[in-house]
Every structure is written in C-alpha cells, then in structure tokens.
Design a protein with these regions (language model features):
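Structured core elements
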Residues: 8, 235-238
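Active-site nucleophile/metal-coordination loop of metallo-enzymes that catalyze phosphate/sulfate
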Residues: 1-5, 12-171, 177-180, 184, ...
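Long, well-ordered, tryptophan-enriched scaffold segments
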Residues: 147-229, 236, 242-244, 252-257, ...
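Residue-level detector of short, conserved catalytic/binding motifs and their immediate flanks
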Residues: 3, 232-234
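Conserved structural scaffold segments of CAZyme catalytic domains across common CAZy folds
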Residues: 243-246, 283
C-alpha cells in the first residue's frame, strides 16, 4: 500500500468570488496542478454539516472531529444549547452537586464566538445558580481572537452581574506550556493577585485607550474579592477542552472542581461527557495493522 497523506490546511477555503479572496488571487502552481489533475470535491465546514447550529461558523475542533469520524457528530455546544432550551441542564446531576456548595466560582472565556465557550452558557449557569440561592463569583477571560479585538467591553455590559476577575485569554487559556502566563491567571483567581478595581468597564476602556486588545488584558480583580476559600466549588464552563486544560490542572488542591466537559482522563465531575464514536478513520486504519504518523502543533 502506498503512503497516504491527509493534510488539513487551516483557514483554507473555496470561493469563486475575487473580493477579499487571497487564495484565489495567489500564485499556487502546485495546488492548482493537483486540483486540475486529480478528482476534487468540496465539503461543508460549518453549521449542521459539522454538528453545530444552523449558520454557525465551524472551527478546527469540529472540522477535525467530523473528518476523523466520517459523519456528523453533534458538538458539545449544540448539546449544551439543547439542554438549556429543554430545561435538562437544571437537573444535570453534576451541576446540582456543584450548586450544593454555598459559593461557586464560574471560570471561562467571555466571547461572542462559539469556539471554546458560549456567552449564552454563562447566562444560563448564572440564572440556575441564582434560582438555587448560591453565591457566585465570575472569573472571565476576554477573547480578542474568536471575537472582535475589543468586544469584551460590550459583553461585560450585557452580563447580569459584574465580573469578579478579568484577564486576557492569552493568560487564562494558554496551551503551549507558557506557565508564566498561566500562573498569572491562577494567582488572580485563587488569590486575587491583580490590579484592584471597582469598575471593570472603566478598567477595560483604559486598556483599550492604551492599545491593549482583549486577548492581552492584564489581571484585574474586584476590590472586595479575597480569593478562593475553603469549601468553595469551581466550575470551568469552557466546552472545548484543550485551551482550558493547562489552567484547570493548576488547581490541584481543590477537590470541588467541576467542568462543563471532560478535560482530562481522570475527570469524573463533568456535566457533559464525550460522545461514543465507533469506527473512526484512525481506528479503522489501526485495525488493519497499518502504521500511522500524526503531526500537529500546540499553538497555531
């Protein structure tokens, strides 16, 4: 059997419209030769075709899963959306357990996108916690990558309660072993080590005026926040695992640690488990006793 390569070109797409289309305008003789010489087909990479809601942009995570499975897999974000709409999130046993604690810290990305987390999920969790009479702290990472560069300000204004801490996603969601960045997010959430503020909107605007975009916002903490206390529960609400895992693993001493999805193999306190997918591409190749080499990067 000849070697076969499955190469995924991140950000590569097809359109016959020339406006804003660098791929069509570029000189790419090798790609053009392959395309003209061999059979070609186009795949949908967003919305229902990859298990997302109608009209929702795709991303690398859902694209890779769909290619590897060879079928449509309902994504975490869609499953959580359905649970919110039909009310089953309220009775989720892990969430109910987390809300038995008098104080819960919600931790994750504040975004208008739907790649790593969802703004609607934050609102739903806060609403359920309020109904349960639980005191909540809100630790948020401003986005700037899957949302606009300075969209965090408008999102903070839409929140039903003020953040407890705020820091850019470059710190809270590093996945490239830059532990000096992760440490800043950890110290902010765990020990309130950041610039104290009474007004997060003013703090964000000051950063914007200095040319700082959302992903690089420095650490801010509410003036009244004193850090995580004994008996507090933590609930990480990002549904995409890879970008939050590094910070999540930093909270080693907290036994009341919950997550929206299964971040590590040792987790058992997660709200939504991974789907059971049989007969994947790599699984079938493995059953055929063929050798495989998988190459990817931790940072795009």
């Amino acid at each position: 059997m000849k070697p076969i390569i499955l190469a995924i070109l991140d950000g590569w797409g097809y359109s016959n419209k020339r406006g804003g289309n660098p791929i069509l305008e570029a000189q790419k003789p090798n790609f053009d030769a392959i395309q003209s010489k061999y059979p070609m087909a186009l795949l949908q990479a967003s919305g229902l075709a990859v298990g997302l809601n109608w009209g929702e942009f795709g991303n690398s995570e859902v694209g890779h899963l769909s290619l590897g499975a060879g079928r449509v897999i309902e994504q975490y974000s869609t499953r959580i959306d359905h649970a919110i709409k039909n009310g089953t999130l309220n009775s989720n046993s892990v969430l109910v357990e987390a809300l038995q604690h008098p104080t819960v810290h919600f931790i994750g990305l504040l975004t208008a996108g739907n790649v790593h987390a969802s703004f609607e999920h934050i609102i739903a969790l806060l609403d359920i916690a309020k109904t349960s009479g639980v005191h909540t702290f809100l630790h948020l990472f401003t986005d700037g990558k899957d949302s606009g560069l300075q969209e965090g300000l408008s999102l903070v204004k839409k929140l039903p309660q003020a953040p407890t801490t705020l820091i850019g996603r470059d710190f809270g969601m590093d996945r490239d072993n830059n532990w000096d960045l992760t440490k800043q997010a950890y110290e902010l959430i765990a020990h309130a080590q950041g610039e104290k503020t009474e007004d997060f909107i003013f703090a964000l605007q000051r950063c914007y005026d200095a040319g700082i975009t959302d992903s690089k916002i420095p650490a801010f903490a509410s003036s009244s926040y004193e850090g995580i206390q004994d008996g507090d529960a933590l609930l990480f609400f990002n549904f995409r695992e890879d970008s939050i895992r590094q910070l999540y693993n930093s909270f080693k001493d907290n036994s009341f640690k919950y997550s929206m999805t299964k971040y590590t193999d040792d987790d058992n306190l997660f709200l939504f488990g991974p789907p059971e997918i049989q007969n994947t591409l790599t699984g079938v190749v493995s059953m055929m006793k063929k050798r495989q080499l998988h190459i990817a990067e931790t940072l795009k």
